[in-house]
Structures are given as structure tokens and as C-alpha cells.
Amino acid sequence: MTAASPVDRERVVRTLTFWLRPAFVLRTLTRFQRVAGFDRAIALASGAFTALVPLAILLTAILPRIDATHAAQTIINRYGLTGGGAEAVKDLLSPAGGTDTGVSVVGAALLMIAVLSFSRALQRLFEQTWELKQLSVRNTVNNLIWIGALVAYTAVSWWIHAIVDRGRVHLASNLLLLPASATFLALTAWLLSAKRIARARLAPFAILGAVLLAIYLTGAGVYLPHLFSSYASRYGVIGAVLAMISALFAFMVVLVASAAIACEVSDELDRIRRGERPPDDEIRREWEALLDELRLRWQTLREQLDGYRNKHSQHDR
């Protein structure tokens, strides 16, 4: 039995410890900043709320043995909502008395446009993170397939949560859903990138995203009911909407960060396989790259603020 060569040992050590290097952390922050991570998360959260809440209402209207009142009560029971939070959920999902709950062709078409818009926002995330050419509407077929996968994953997720967990902390169900979540995330990136990301490069995103989102969802089960009830008690349905968008924003920050980290993990593993050694001034280079991205974002923000001020000053005249 031959001993492992020094090169093999070095490669193993680098594979296991690269994420501890400051340069890798700086590269990840630069990638997150390059895709405008927080702005992207806000856009995704808004798109998700615009698309998914109407989709839930539509499903309660067309699926047999499911109505909006039952769906609202299920959410209330699942998260232990009381008081203003419970009333806000009922007002948000349940139709008013005497209201026709039928689904029109125009309404269904508008809903599909909203869901497609959300899927394209996710598509732009993967295109920018992995530096791919933007396809926009040319990837519509894959977007539609992904929407079907999203509905299926949501149904499976809801079913597992319903039969496994009874309290607010859904630790067991989130652990059981890890394989399904990883598979869905890999499928999401593969479809929305028009299958341009190699499957091997999707593994870090699928695994990391599934783990981080499971941690977030477990914590959300604790703080979300308090946030929801507090906002709804103060501001009614508007407060419930703000709470939902806040929760979705945090969810999307985790998703965007997972994509940025996973992309850098894939690149780093590729460099290790090729035997490339990090340069001596790697930390300085990555720090300068991060500062350049921050300066660019600050300059863009200042230009937007100056344009806003000039517009209002001309309007006042």
C-alpha cells in the first residue's frame, strides 16, 4: 500500500479548509455585493408576495374540498396565531360575505403573469451570480416547468409539516425535507439557468441552500407568530402584509447568499482540482475588489439620490 503523495494531501487539506481562508470570505462578499444581494432579496420578496399569495387564493378556489376559510384556519393553527394575527389571516385569505369566489380567465391569466414574473426574477439571480447571458422570455418553457415543480414541492412540504409537527418549532419536518429541498433547489437553478449550469456545480448550492433555509425556517417558526401578531394588531391587514414581506425578505437574503457562496465554492473546488495555488497577495486583491464593488454601489446610490433631488427641485419651481 503506497502512501499518499504530498500533492494529494495538500489537495485534501485545501478542500477541507478553503472556506476558512479570509480571501474566500472576501470573494463571497464581493459576489454577494456584485449581484446587489439586498436589493435582489427585496425584489424577490415583493415578487413572491405578489405571486404566491394570489396563487394560494386561486388554489383554494379551484381545488375540491379546500376553501379559503379552511386554508386560513390551517395557517393559524400551524403557527399558533392569536388575536390580531389570526384575524388578519382570515381577512387576507377568506372572501367577504356574498363575494363570488369563482376564477375568471382574466384573473387566472394575470396570476400566471405574476408567477412568471417572479420566476424570471429568480432566473436573473442565477444568471448574474453565475455570470450567464440573460435569456429573459426565451426561457419561458423552463419557467413554466419550474412553476409546476414549485407547486408540487409546496404541496409535499405542507403535507409533511402537517403530519409530522404539531408545535411551532418544525425541526423534525425541516430535517425530513432536506433531501427534497436540496433536489428542488438544484432543479430550480438548473431550469431557470436554461440548463447552462453543470449539475456538478449545482451540488454546493443545493446542499448549502437546503441547510441554511432549514435553519431559517426553524427559527422563523419561533419569531414569525410574534412578528405577525404584533404587526397585525397595530395595523390590521396592512400589518400582516408587512410581516409577510419581512419574512419573505429574510428568506430571500438566505437564498441569495446561498447562491453567492455556492458559486464561489464551485469555483474554488475547480481551482483545487486544477492544482492552482492562491497568489501571495490574494487577500489584498480580494479586499480591493470588494472595496471597488462597494464604491460602485455607493456611486450608483448617490446618482439616484441626486436625480431624485433634482427632479423634486424642478417640480417645486
Where are these regions (language model features)?
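Membrane-embedded alpha-helices and immediately adjacent juxtamembrane helical segments
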Residues: 1-317
